[in-house]
Amino acid sequence: MDPATNSPIMPIDLPIMHDSDRYDFVKDIGSGNFGVARLMTDRVTKELVAVKYIERGEKIDENVQREIINHRSLRHPNIVRFKEVILTPSHLAIVMEYAAGGELYERICNAGRFSEDEARFFFQQLISGVSYCHAMQICHRDLKLENTLLDGSPAPRLKICDFGYSKSSVLHSQPKSTVGTPAYIAPEILLRQEYDGKLADVWSCGVTLYVMLVGAYPFEDPQEPRDYRKTIQRILSVTYSIPEDLHLSPECRHLISRIFVADPATRITIPEITSDKWFLKNLPGDLMDENRMGSQFQEPEQPMQSLDTIMQIISEATIPTVRNRCLDDFMADNLDLDDDMDDFDSESEIDVDSSGEIVYAL
């Protein structure tokens, strides 16, 4: 698996919060389609936090609202902690826990692949976080290495992040849209069937486990890894293999085979994974009591931001500033954006952009 080429963080005119505000700027730490992320310091607690800036206006869509509302409801050690949203003159800012260890993806790229014990250590934490999400009736729908962060401890704690594609069965209907990243997407999603988001998350967890163990994606053609059509075909036919020279225990191979099952009705479930023999081996004590896991997060000095306040801020953020409207007009008049996937089958039901993201809800 080749490391993704990280684009340089372009300077952007974002407001540094004023002296009267709660956070002080430290440095820029990331950028993407959403905007930019900054490392900030909480003036009161001195804690480092990550602040994700999204430009006010049309970028504040239902995905942003869903991300914030779902993320706010989750309080678990294996999920990046949501703190609050703030409205600046030009951006909506989402304040959350800072994971100093970076992406799990980067750790695998540096290591090549993990030992079976190390992969299990992170997989146990991933399943713990996903199990909690499902207990809260939230399906992530975009689980991948880039959406799993690590804290800075010697034995890193895994943190699930980015709930932009998440769906709540309490607040939303049964998932019917095609979202996520092709390498991680379950067959039933690609077939545009109404699907169980929890079982689709299981498949994505299986892809994450495979990559940790093998150092490559299970359904990519090694000769043409960027051929997304071929990746999709291999997912639909569940065509994958484990290198012959890779020494994995029979129990590990068996678990992978129970995850990569095309029919979601016969695929292993999260509760079944948590009782699997391979999963339970060397299970850390703090992961054994799921009820205790959800209560480890206590911040009495910082009450949770109310839902009414959040919805009001999001509503105001949908109104673009004058500066942003002018910039949008300029960009529309001067840029001719090419679609890198023009050669993708025009009759295909799936739309994929150049980053490999499934971009249209079908």
Curated annotation (Swiss-Prot):
Q: Any idea which positions bind ATP?
A: 29-37, 52
Expression tissues: Expressed in seeds, seedlings, roots (especially in tips), stems, leaves, shoots, flowers and siliques.
GO term, biological process aspect, one: abscisic acid-activated signaling pathway
PANTHER family listed in its UniProt record: SERINE/THREONINE KINASE, SERINE_THREONINE-PROTEIN KINASE SRK2D
- The organism's superkingdom is given as Eukaryota
| Reactions the enzyme catalyzes | L-seryl-[protein] + ATP = O-phospho-L-seryl-[protein] + ADP + H(+); L-threonyl-[protein] + ATP = O-phospho-L-threonyl-[protein] + ADP + H(+)
Q: Which CDD domains match?
A: STKc_SnRK2-3
Q: How does it assemble?
A: Interacts with ABI1. Interacts with FREE1 (via C-terminus).
Q: In the record, what terms sit under GO molecular function?
A: ATP binding; protein serine kinase activity; protein serine/threonine kinase activity
Q: Which keywords does this Swiss-Prot/TrEMBL entry list?
A: Abscisic acid signaling pathway, ATP-binding, Kinase, Nucleotide-binding, Serine/threonine-protein kinase, Transferase
- Indicate yes or no for the key word Cell inner membrane: no
Q: Which family does it belong to?
A: Belongs to the protein kinase superfamily. Ser/Thr protein kinase family.
From the Swiss-Prot or TrEMBL record, give the protein name.
Answer: Serine/threonine-protein kinase SRK2D
The residue ranges of the Protein kinase domain are 23-279
Give its E.C. classification number: 2.7.11.1
